[in-house]
Amino acid sequence: MDFEDYNSTYEDSYTDDFDTIVALEEFSPLEGRVVRIFLVVVYSIICFLGILGNGLVIVIATFKMKKTVNTVWFLNLAVADFLFNVFLPIHIAYAAMDYHWVFGTAMCKISNFLLIHNMYTSVFLLTVISFDRCISVLLPVWSQNHRSIRLAYMACVVIWVLAFFLSSPSLVFRDTAHLHGKISCFNNFSLSATSSSSWPTHPQMDTVGFGRQMVVTITRFLCGFLVPVLIISACYFTIVYKLRRNRLAKTKKPFKIIVTIIITFFLCWCPYHTLYLLELHHRAMPGSVFSLGVPLATAIAIANSCMNPILYVFMGQDFKKFKVALFSRLVNALSEDTGHSSYPSHRSFTKMSSMNERETSML
């Protein structure tokens, strides 16, 4: 994702999307500094929690647990989030240096590519996990006979390759240019030449460039948000219906977990994608909508990368009965269910569930 994309000017020289200098015409120097400090602090916290939490999940899933389908999902999700957070310091430095890019054009392309790739990988993995759990409930016998670690790894390979393909525009359009004495890393959809004394043409003044911007933006919205949300929602509501029909859910907790998963995913990514769609018609919107909204929306979206380990531990748990060690909770959250029920593989259907198998039926 474009972490610096909240930083553009909204005038005739407007660049390809939210890039470079934090809305100079919208912010006073003091306001701009406050926004930069806010982003540096928030991104730093997310980076620290993301590297620590996902690193712990990677270690546990790799060295402390038996390989199962669930651990394959969780390991890949943690790796994607970990890589996402490893490259956050570059963008933290970019904001701290008043949006002066000193890392070169190649790193401008690569860092943004990796961030977009992580967005797609995480979303696709969450979707596959939801579909996998839905199949385990609807077709338990088939799932037991065909659900294998090899198939899970194959699915992960497809996900990473597909994410690579969808993220490749960053390698093509990401560019650097000079503006107001600073070097900016931005999306040059028009592919116009840049120099120390010039700035790329606004994409709406270049039909081809604006068309490329529309394709990239709409593709990200459809493939990175809308379609996954619809699939995840359909899977979880199907699970709820099946459980209630078979009276397997004895409490309302499973339904709360499902609703929370959907709402969390939706709230994290909806503002980000909404603002990018609005950006296509930014001239009809007040500049403050983007200069203030995009930093907040971006922070919320990237926070998703550090939330998963926390949700593994606490989702569906009663904090008043917090007696189990953190390490044990992570292991339980990542473990393949081995209990006995009509739908044995369904008890751990969510990557965020961590309940005691002796006492509770996990989703």
UniProtKB/Swiss-Prot annotation:
Which cysteines does the record link by disulfide bonds?
A: 108-185
Q: Which residues lie on this side of the membrane: Extracellular?
A: 1-39, 93-109, 174-220, 278-283
Query: Any idea where this protein resides?
Result: Cell membrane
One annotated Gene Ontology cellular component of this protein: plasma membrane
Protein keywords:
Cell membrane, Disulfide bond, G-protein coupled receptor, Glycoprotein, Membrane, Phosphoprotein, Receptor, Transducer, Transmembrane, Transmembrane helix
Which membrane topology term applies here? Multi-pass membrane protein
Q: Which residues are glycosylated?
A: 7, 188
Q: Name one Pfam family in it.
A: 7tm_1
The similarity annotation says:
Belongs to the chemokine-like receptor (CMKLR) family.
Q: Which residues does the record list as Phosphothreonine (modified residue)?
A: 338
Keyword Acetylation appears in the UniProt entry: no
Which organism does this record belong to?
Answer: Sus scrofa
Q: What is this protein called?
A: Chemerin-like receptor 1
Entry keyword annotation includes Disulfide bond: yes
Transmembrane segments in this chain: where? Answer: 40-60, 72-92, 110-130, 153-173, 221-241, 257-277, 284-304
Which intervals of the chain are annotated as region Disordered? 337-363
